[in-house]
Amino acid sequence: MTAIPVKKKVQVSFVIRDEKEPMHRSGVNCLQYDAQTGRLFSGGSDTIIRIWKSPDRKDDSGSSYSVGGKTRVRRDLHLQSMEHHTDWVNDIVLCCGVISASSDTTVKVWNAQKGFCMSTLRTHRDYVRALAYARDVEMVASGGFDQLIYLWDIATLTKLTALNNTVTTSSLTGNKDSIYSLATNPSGTVVISGSTEKVLRVFDPRACQKLMKLRGHTDNVKAVVVNRDGTQCISASSDGTIKLWSIGQQCCISSLKCHSESVWALQVDSNFSCVYSGGRDKRIFRTAINDFKTAQLMFIEDAPVQRLQLIDSESRFIWTATWNSSIKRWPLPSDAQISVEIKSDQYGETIPSIHEPDLTIPGAASIRQHVVLNDKRHIVTKDTDDNVAMWDVLKGRKVCDHGKRPMEEVIKDHFKKVFVPSWFTVDLKSGMLQITLDESDFFSAWVSAKDAGFPNIQNDTKINYGGMLLRALFEHWSRSFSDVDEESPTHRFNSVPGHTPLILCESTGRPIFRLMIRDAAHETESQMLSDFVPPWVLDVVERNQLPKFNKMPFFLLPHLSLGIKTPKKDRLSATEMLQVRKVMEHVYEKILNVNDASYSENGIPSAAQMLSPSLQANIEERVELYCQDQKLDPEMDLRTVKHFIWKQGGDLMLYYKPIR
């Protein structure tokens, strides 16, 4: 018997952002420098790879201003952004172009000159954390949380395209835990991995064989570098130590604990004569490899250090990437200028050799807090600069800025006593708002046209937020249904900005396809959407079909003040979107107006006694409706009454009282 493959659940996500994002929005995870072009490459938690000019120390051209003396802040260095990842960019290497590794589980090959993704490798099944490049043999190794290392031939990768990206790869197996670091020498004779297993594993990539394990660390190995001939390596660990190893002797030659916390980043010079280290304690140390007992404190960053990039040329620099969104360049003194003597201030703190960077590439603030308002359409956020803003999910854009105003005040000012079910989720991992729509609850947000802010539409018209948003996200797609009348629940009252990234992904977050929504009009993207768009999206976008309203049972009883001993208890069922006004009309027409007598059989005054049988618009002047002894607003819907007033399980109990 052949098993029927289970079709994976597909979600739809989009990111609310500016059209151009020239600055990193969150922490910077990786750096690479191209000495031939003088360009710096950076990858960040905001999913974007950026390319920067790296000016010479004497180059004062461009827009810059000073901070704290000699530091120049340059806002004119951004050259290009490369976007196609959907999660953190964890590592990049420069070869024929750029190869990147991401927490979206993919490895991507880029044309750096034109700035586009040539192909996507989906071999890894979990976060891809590290890359290593063997320059002389044109090989790249990738490792991640799936405990596997894959070897890639660069010549093969450069021939791949977005539609033809099938490639054969070899793998190195044996790791028992998530891989956080990788290193290889230029000739590709060894590949070394560090992981949460607390050991270094050494492989021969030519034969795809394990060679040895190097034991000694007591925590995760976060960084590894290896010398040119593959005989020595240096590792950095969350245990706070850096260790020098002999691969031939399979032992630790020396260990140094100059850092007070985890060590995350290493860089060695071209001669493998000194190593620079940085980590959680924000301090960058320089250690001579032939004297692995002492380290000089070079400088102190203002946030934990994630990556270092040494520029080992005539003008020596080191670039730093931290938890902050800015990137800094620190000028390095010559070896002769570095004092072996450790100097301390009056409090006993070690004085760094370099007091400030000479150049800063500024970053932008990232969103760190959010609250979805109870209208389930607007979101209030606070960023790392304490700026508060409000966003409209339906329009995919910012509504207004509130500056440094307390977030709680803004939320209170925009509170509405209306209940709308949750129909999307919010993720801030990129420092920007990412909205995810799931089949299970996406269609649950039915609201009246009035509550949705469309006063010109008939009050009885019901709007489906999910359907409206889907139509806006896919409006450029050729298969999108366009003949929608004004009172349709998915009528396109607004459009989402064309630059908005749209992502189809599995429920695990693993991406299937990413594009800018305006590009859905292009033939290639349109065809790929046809291959990947799930049926629940097609129902709305292509066929304009929506699920029916949810039904809500409730009881109607005469108010206790009427003194009826054996009241009739009517159990009714209606859409949860039904307004209280409609229930009042039902009471007036069907329950109170039973005959023309002065009093009906149950002792309640008949409607005919009060006024003519024809129902007037002001029903609130004829009937009152109560729940939990609270008089109900005729404009409320049953869903809101149950959420804000009934506040318990079981069927809703409503009590009517005629106005005498």
Curated annotation (Swiss-Prot):
PROSITE patterns named in the record: WD_REPEATS_1, WD_REPEATS_2, WD_REPEATS_REGION
Keywords of this entry: Repeat, Ubl conjugation pathway, WD repeat
GO biological process, one term: double-strand break repair via homologous recombination
Record's keyword annotation contains Heme: no
Per-repeat ranges for WD: 23-78, 84-120, 123-162, 174-213, 216-255, 258-297, 300-341, 362-401
One of the Pfam families matching this protein, by short name: DUF3337
GO molecular function: ubiquitin binding
Keyword Acetylation assigned: no
InterPro entries cross-referenced by the UniProt entry: G-protein_beta_WD-40_rep, WD40/YVTN_repeat-like_dom_sf, WD40_repeat_CS, WD40_repeat_dom_sf, WD40_rpt, WDR48, WDR48/Bun107
UniProt function note: Regulator of deubiquitinating complexes. Activates deubiquitination by increasing the catalytic turnover without increasing the affinity of deubiquitinating enzymes for the substrate.
Family affiliation: Belongs to the WD repeat WDR48 family.
Annotated protein name in UniProt: WD repeat-containing protein 48 homolog
Organismal lineage: Eukaryota, Metazoa, Ecdysozoa, Nematoda, Chromadorea
